[in-house]
């Protein structure tokens, strides 16, 4: 069915006021959107930052009168409205639209990431079937791609691989399909653990091949290979811990790092690893090396 969509151009200071007012006048959903393609990276803990120029989108039943909505908003806020507009939009199958846009992707020489509902383009390739679930990694982001390509270029046969911050499990599962003996995944999010388990089952990975833990339950270990696609801040603060999780002679690959953060992250690992040249893609970097 169609919907009435109301759009307001607001500042961060106005966000809560207008969100509450829109819900008060009958909006069935309220969404914040970036108005100027302004990135927000690594916000402070316990904060939910907004862009300096934000669009607030609200959906109403199609028979709602936009002029009445605007009048009630003025009454509730006691102020003239910021820039605003209303339009009727047709309903669509958002999940199907997203699925149609998620296509198989190749990484390196052997590895394909294939949506679970899609046929693999190369039957004889290493095909990882993925249902990302709750917006965990799909391979479309440059940092995930950098890690997948790195894994494809390693000799993983017989190794134990640790995926630190496993998300969808895409890196751990890829390592297993590329020949790793076993993999360990850890994440602070219980839903990530479940997504990883589901994706492992979808790819025929035996339970004993992939162990999944919340960080507080992960056993002491030293892996042959560690991959961590998280954020620069945690990578720096956790450098002693992550370095200790790699055996001497073992391999490390890190991403989730902005280009301007690369040198700082590399410096945090330089004492313990012989580092490779930093690889840059679309403003993001990968740092890799071998444990001394």
Swiss-Prot record:
InterPro entries: Ribosomal_L11_MeTrfase_PrmA, Ribosomal_PrmA_MeTrfase, SAM-dependent_MTases_sf. This is Ribosomal protein L11 methyltransferase. NCBIfam families: prmA. It is found in: Cytoplasm. S-adenosyl-L-methionine binds at residues 144, 165, 187, 229. The keyword Methyltransferase applies. The gene is prmA. GO terms for cellular component: cytosol. It comes from Pseudomonas putida (strain W619). Its EC number is 2.1.1.-. The keyword Methyltransferase applies. It comes from the Bacteria.
């Amino acid at each position: 069915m169609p919907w009435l969509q109301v759009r307001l151009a607001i500042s961060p200071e106005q966000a809560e006021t207008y969100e509450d007012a829109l819900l008060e006048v009958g909006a069935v959903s309220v969404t914040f959107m970036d108005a100027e393609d302004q990135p927000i990276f690594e916000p402070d803990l316990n904060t939910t930052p907004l862009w300096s120029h934000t669009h607030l989108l609200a959906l109403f039943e199609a028979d709602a009168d936009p002029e009445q909505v605007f009048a009630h908003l003025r009454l509730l806020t006691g102020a003239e409205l910021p820039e605003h507009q209303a339009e009727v939009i047709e309903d669509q199958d958002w999940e199907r639209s997203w699925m149609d846009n998620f296509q198989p992707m190749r990484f390196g020489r052997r590895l394909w990431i294939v949506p679970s509902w899609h046929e693999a383009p190369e039957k004889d390739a290493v095909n990882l079937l993925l249902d990302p679930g709750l917006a965990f990694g799909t391979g479309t982001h440059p940092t995930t791609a950098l890690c997948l390509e790195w894994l494809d270029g390693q000799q993983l046969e017989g190794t134990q691989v640790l995926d630190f911050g496993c998300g969808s499990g895409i890196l751990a599962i890829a390592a297993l399909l590329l020949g790793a003996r076993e993999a360990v995944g850890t994440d602070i999010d219980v839903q990530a653990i479940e997504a990883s388990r589901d994706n492992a089952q979808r790819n025929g990975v035996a339970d004993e091949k992939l162990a999944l833990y919340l960080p507080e339950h992960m056993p002491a270990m030293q892996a042959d290979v560690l991959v961590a696609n998280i954020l620069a801040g945690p990578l720096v603060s956790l450098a002693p811990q992550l370095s200790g999780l790699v055996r001497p002679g073992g391999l490390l690959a890190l991403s989730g790092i902005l280009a301007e953060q690369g040198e700082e992250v590399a410096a945090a690992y330089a004492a313990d690893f012989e580092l490779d040249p930093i690889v840059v893609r679309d403003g993001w970097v990968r740092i890799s090396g071998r444990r001394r």
